[in-house]
Amino acid sequence: MMDINIQDSFYHTVLHKAIYRKLYDIAEFLLEKGASTELKDLDGYTPLQLVIHEGYTEMVKFNNMEQIIEIKTNRISTR
């Protein structure tokens, strides 16, 4: 079985690449399969930070009101 969170030489995961290419269905599929939202790329972006940085706000969904997103000086965490 392949590691869904494998990173390339730029530390991009498949989820990072799906976001860069605006492949929203694939990104959603990867999240459903357990892709990590915590891994950072070479620039220090997690997938969620990348979504915000690139302005892909259509990808942001609030499925759970208990999740609070904090944006602090290039740091995003969920609790």
Swiss-Prot record:
<feature type="repeat" description="ANK 1">
    <location>
        <begin position="10"/>
        <end position="39"/>
    </location>
</feature>
<feature type="repeat" description="ANK 2">
    <location>
        <begin position="43"/>
        <end position="77"/>
    </location>
</feature>
<protein>
    <recommendedName>
        <fullName>Putative ankyrin repeat protein RC0860</fullName>
    </recommendedName>
</protein>
<dbReference type="InterPro" id="IPR002110">
    <property type="entry name" value="Ankyrin_rpt"/>
</dbReference>
<dbReference type="Pfam" id="PF12796">
    <property type="entry name" value="Ank_2"/>
</dbReference>
<keyword id="KW-0040">ANK repeat</keyword>
<keyword id="KW-0677">Repeat</keyword>
<dbReference type="InterPro" id="IPR036770">
    <property type="entry name" value="Ankyrin_rpt-contain_sf"/>
</dbReference>
